[in-house]
Structures are given as structure tokens and as C-alpha cells.
A protein has these predicted regions:
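Short glycine-enriched nucleophile-adjacent loop
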Residues: 130-134
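Short, surface-exposed "cap/lid" segments of acyl-processing enzymes
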Residues: 27-71
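A generic structural signal for alpha->beta connector loops
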Residues: 17, 47, 59, 118-120
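Cap/lid segment of the alpha/beta-hydrolase catalytic domain
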Residues: 68-89
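Alpha/beta-hydrolase fold nucleophile elbow
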Residues: 110-127
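Alpha/beta-hydrolase active-site loop
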Residues: 84-113
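N-terminal cap/lid segment of alpha/beta-hydrolase-fold proteins
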Residues: 1-28
Length: 134
């Protein structure tokens, strides 16, 4: 099964944008998975891109995002060099950002398709991202 990757961007007035990557299956999606990275982590760390591909190959839309204060920047998404941003990060901020992403997906209709509005949604995460997902 073929799949595609597409960028995701959620801009909020006066705040840092939330960047992410969609993994899209070539067939009608079974549902959507939102993936949240862990503490001092980022969406491209380790196997997360391959995990997204695996979900898409299995027929799921998969979105992995970077929290805005995770220590990386859009211009250097794999480098932990934003110490000021990381120092301002909180569990509550990550919870608010994941909620904003879910609200944006609902508003855009990304959690459904042309044939159904009852597709399942899963929010999963690694380490602290798993706690935020709960």
C-alpha cells in the first residue's frame, strides 16, 4: 500500500506555530492517530517517522507533531538548541497544544472523509507524550 507525507501547520495568534507531518494512506483511512512525542523529544526522533509510515501502510492517517517548546525550532527540527523555549515548557502547555490540534482537525473535517463521519481517533504518545495523550 502506497502512502504520502504532507506537512501540518497550526498557527495561533501571538504564539509559536505547531508543526507536524501527516502520513496519509493511499486508500480510505480507517481512522486517525495523533502521536505526541516525549519529554526532551521531537517528532523526528528515532523510529517515529517509520512508525507513522507503518500506520499509514496499515490504512491509518497518522499525524506526528512537535510541541512548540520542546527545545527544537522549525529551522532546526532535529537539534536541541532552543533552551529558552524549553525552559518555558510545561505539561499544561503541551496539553493545551494537543487539544488545539484536535480542535483544528475537527474543524477542518480531517477526522472524517467523504463517506463517513464516525472514523475512530486515537491519541498516543511516548513517555510524557503518553501522559499528555491520556
Amino acid at each position: 500500500m502506497q502512502m504520502q507525507r504532507h506537512p501540518f501547520l497550526l498557527e495561533k495568534a501571538g504564539e509559536r506555530p505547531i508543526h507536524g507531518v501527516w502520513h496519509i494512506p493511499s486508500t480510505e483511512a480507517k481512522g486517525t492517530v495523533l502521536f505526541l512525542h516525549g519529554y526532551k523529544g521531537y517528532m523526528d526522533w528515532g523510529a517515529w517517522p517509520m512508525v507513522g509510515d507503518a500506520f499509514a501502510h496499515a490504512g491509518w492517517r497518522f499525524l506526528r507533531i512537535n510541541f512548540t517548546h520542546n527545545g527544537t525550532t522549525p529551522s532546526a527540527p532535529k537539534s536541541f538548541n532552543d533552551l529558552e523555549g524549553f525552559a518555558a515548557n510545561t505539561y499544561s502547555r503541551e496539553l493545551e497544544e494537543s487539544t488545539a490540534v484536535l480542535q483544528a482537525l475537527r474543524a477542518e473535517g480531517a477526522l472524517s472523509d467523504a463517506t463517513a463521519t464516525d472514523k475512530p481517533l486515537a491519541v498516543i504518545g511516548h513517555s510524557r507524550g503518553g501522559g499528555v495523550a491520556c
